[in-house]
Amino acid sequence: MRIGLVCSGGDCAGMNPATKKFVEYSLELGYEPYFIREGLEGLIEGKIEPATLKEVSGILHKGGTILQSSRSKRFFDPAFRLQAYQNLQRHSIEALVTLGGDGSFRAMEVLAKEHSLLYAGIPATIDNDIRASDYALGVDSALNVILESTDRLRDTAESFRRAFVVEVMGRDCGYLALASAIACGAEVCIIPEMGYSLQSLGARLKEELGTGKRRYVLAIVSEGAKASSEVVSWLKEEVGIETRITILGHVQRGGSPSVYDRLMGFRFMQKALDSLSLGKSGVVVLREGRVEFLSSQEASSAPASLPLDMVRLASRLMF
């Protein structure tokens, strides 16, 4: 069987370790691995080629993806999906592994249903917003970037008796903000899934700053909460502390993958290929420490939620 690998949507650390495992394990199973370059746009344009061990040698430490990625509006046009499938047919590719997020998985599901194609989706997004999975590739590496940045900002905040508002990525999911706020010892955490009370937070912070218990404030705000400017104004005008804002942006996606992301890349890919070899299509997920393979329907119907124990840990940072 010939199997293709495509990276779709936003890049993240962990994609390259998964890519290396794709080639090595496919060959071990007796399959022929193929690379699709430049994401779904590359699939439409026919940028498909045989994958070799030489290409994946020495890529474990590299961030992003050696295959390159893209976002493709054209893929939602049936005519372009047919073109993509015909490109797969030219290479006799019977199955696809997709590294990406929910949008990429939905696109693959449509293509698979239209043309009886096997596919396996592997969560790869720093947003960690795949409903059925506790984890997506890139999250741990992104958190390490955030932690390094907040540790540095804390140094300068304490030196000048300032507040820093740090906006982190995550779209509509507050996992990155929640986890990093707990881990870096932030005083404020604002995420889209939870309400917050600046009034009660302000009373506590003013008391601590006024009595000398605290010299600085670190606030972590998820981009999806759309509250960074509000928090900056509140800290300046209500709490009464000089405030700066830092938007970390795409730096969170880059850099060498962490040990955990490398291991999860291997585990996710092995499960994906094992499932395809059994004729199954669906999505690889991590649930309660176990790597599982779910049908697309099971994966999409799972409720969206943050870990309750983490929410409890951070409750003092919101109210």
UniProtKB/Swiss-Prot annotation:
Sites where the protein binds ADP: R154, G185, A186, E187
EC numbers, comma separated: 2.7.1.11
Keyword Nucleotide-binding attached: yes
SUPFAM superfamilies per UniProt: Phosphofructokinase
One Gene Ontology biological process: canonical glycolysis
Subcellular location: Cytoplasm
Gene Ontology MF: a single term: fructose-6-phosphate binding
Stored InterPro entries: ATP_PFK, ATP_PFK_prok-type, PFKA_ATP_prok, Phosphofructokinase_CS, Phosphofructokinase_dom, PKF_sf
Family statement drawn from the similarity comment of this UniProt entry: Belongs to the phosphofructokinase type A (PFKA) family. ATP-dependent PFK group I subfamily. Prokaryotic clade 'B1' sub-subfamily.
PANTHER family recorded: ATP-DEPENDENT 6-PHOSPHOFRUCTOKINASE (PTHR13697:SF4), PHOSPHOFRUCTOKINASE (PTHR13697)
Name under which the protein is recorded: ATP-dependent 6-phosphofructokinase
Originating organism: Wolinella succinogenes (strain ATCC 29543 / DSM 1740 / CCUG 13145 / JCM 31913 / LMG 7466 / NCTC 11488 / FDC 602W)
